[in-house]
Amino acid sequence: MSEPIQNENVESNVADAADIAAATAATEEFTNTIGDAISTSTEEETFEAAPAVLDGPIWTVGRRKRAIVRVRMVAGSGEITCNGRTLEDYFPNKLHQQLIKAPLVLLGREGQFDIHANLGGGGPTGQAGAFRLAIARALNAYNPAERPTLKKAGFLTRDARAVERKKAGLHKARRAPQYSKR
């Protein structure tokens, strides 16, 4: 068997104020040298992109739940057409209209483009969410310099939530039959 190691200077393991001050100074000096190696400039480099010119239609696709929306965006007066009908006729709910127009309003481009959409599948909320994603993707394709603004607002993120499938032996996706102890 091995004998326990004897520490002759047990009392020297206790740090005094001078040791703590020296360690703090060394730590600060070390972190300052690390900080110098990493460029942490607070000024963000912004590149002014040339004014984007829309030479042809921009085609994009947006999906949400079961809805799929195909959008064709062209330069125009701000008319939005959904399956041959106006936006107000197709989406009478003002909340859905605001949801769809949100990327255009954020970038201040409400009356700049004509948007023609082919909507299919899902319900009104899913179609509105898919429409918003398709418009945001079209605006991103038109001017990639505005991508950070759209990304920060969450307009370029595809909402992956969908209905969970029903499982065998359960009433619904997670609803189990009532438990009976006896």
UniProtKB/Swiss-Prot annotation:
Coiled-coil positions: none
Disulfide partners: none
SUPFAM superfamilies: Ribosomal protein S5 domain 2-like
Entry superkingdom: Bacteria
TM annotation in the entry: none
PROSITE patterns according to UniProt: RIBOSOMAL_S9
Gene Ontology process terms (BP): translation
InterPro entries reported in the protein's UniProt record: Ribosomal_Su5_D2-typ_SF (IPR020568), Ribosomal_uS9 (IPR000754), Ribosomal_uS9_bac/plastid (IPR023035), Ribosomal_uS9_CS (IPR020574), Ribsml_uS5_D2-typ_fold_subgr (IPR014721)
GO MF terms held by the record: RNA binding; structural constituent of ribosome
Alphabetically ordered keywords of this record: Ribonucleoprotein, Ribosomal protein
One CC-aspect GO term: cytoplasm
Pfam families found in the cross-reference section: Ribosomal_S9
Similarity field: Belongs to the universal ribosomal protein uS9 family.
Protein name per the record: Small ribosomal subunit protein uS9
Organism field: Corynebacterium efficiens (strain DSM 44549 / YS-314 / AJ 12310 / JCM 11189 / NBRC 100395)
